[in-house]
Amino acid sequence: MRRVKIVATLGPSVSTPEQIRELVDAGMDVARLNLSHGSHDVHRQSYLAVRQASDASGRGVGVLVDLQGPKIRLGTFAEGPVLLEPGAEFIVTTEDVPGDRHMVSTTHTGLPTDVTPGDLVLVDDGRIELQVTKVDGPRVHTTVIEGGRVSDHKGFNLPGVPVSVPALSDKDVEDLRWALRMGADMVALSFVRSAADAKEVHAIMENEGISVPVLAKVEKPQAIDNLEEIVQAFDGIMVARGDLGVELPLEQVPLVQKRAIQECREAGKPVIVATQMLESMMSANRPTRAEASDVANAVLDGADALMLSGETSVGHNPALVVQTMSTIIEHVESEALDRLPPLQEEVHGSTARAMTRAAVDVAQYVGGSHLIAFTETGRSARLIARWRCDTPLLAFTPNPRVRSQLALVWGVETFLVPQVRHTDDMVQQVDKALLEIGRASVGERVVIVAGVPPGIPGTTNGMRVHKMGSAGPGGGV
């Protein structure tokens, strides 16, 4: 079984129910709806197709809604794209002007107060580089350092500059409410800078009466400075290497990736590595050797999930991309699972952390064939998963949304089961589920972690070694 999960972005190349089912069959664990593009109606149709494909496959495929965030962009050019020549002056203004090769407007009204002479303005993921020479009222004068062709609405970055934009734009608020009402399993917040950015999202969720995990996209230098508190405040992290590689020197990105993965593992929260993982497969049938190594190294770093963006959303063969990534992951895991970085040993912790840590040790000691977490919220499964152990990890939950959310977590395979009322019900469910599908044999030992009494979220306090086929009183050994 593949442990590292695959997040695939939907888009024009995967827009029909048949195409989405192909991605699920190829190994997609979580579908990403990127709200930087497309309408609510289009994304709703994709959402419904994912649910249909998930039900048909018998797997809990998650749906991640990725909010656009307050990305700052250029305005429009009156006569189409323009060519910026190195050495030329170019003005970016908050005024509403028809753009040309001398000047263009911007959506960021705070630009003149954010920048000072000497600051860099990197347009279109750094392909075009401008340097600020002076600020004159609403106009920011720059000199073109690296030129090129620029078109309407291109995003730009201000590396090293604290940007005065809110955590959520008006569009993000509308999109978040829509996603919650639709039934998204989790949402991702773009351009997170501090733990405080989570507060507005949680306030909207409270207002809607719907709460789902919120992932912070780490793509700003301020997020790196505040990484530990961001990990604690959010429910997971996405290492968004696209904007991160523009905002930071490229040589720093791999180390940020490793640090973010380790911080999330210590906290028991999922972490996604994203951007340009198999980008050449947008048009080719095979990845480059460097891309294969990039995927392998993210696996060896201990990531929960790897994300495909344009490779699946607008690529020429999305299912092949997912299959290729799955093959690389499986091979690396089969050869090098023991090379993952170890966790720091905790001196003090919660009962749940103690029980899940002990369960990992007990499973190895007694030769358990599976670790099983009965969970209402998914937390106990996540706490076990952070140890990245060889023993297969199964989660049993009565909550369909928890099943879909755990699709993002390393190594977790989830069974949807009726609510249990007694610990004897647990072992009966384990016997029924695993023996019927041939996942375990009579006499094998499994280690079960649960809360007693059952059905109360956040009460993981018990562990049981169960001999398969002996369900009922006395089933533990």
Residue ranges and their predicted role:
Residues 1-477:
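Non-catalytic helical/linker scaffolds that mediate oligomerization, partner binding
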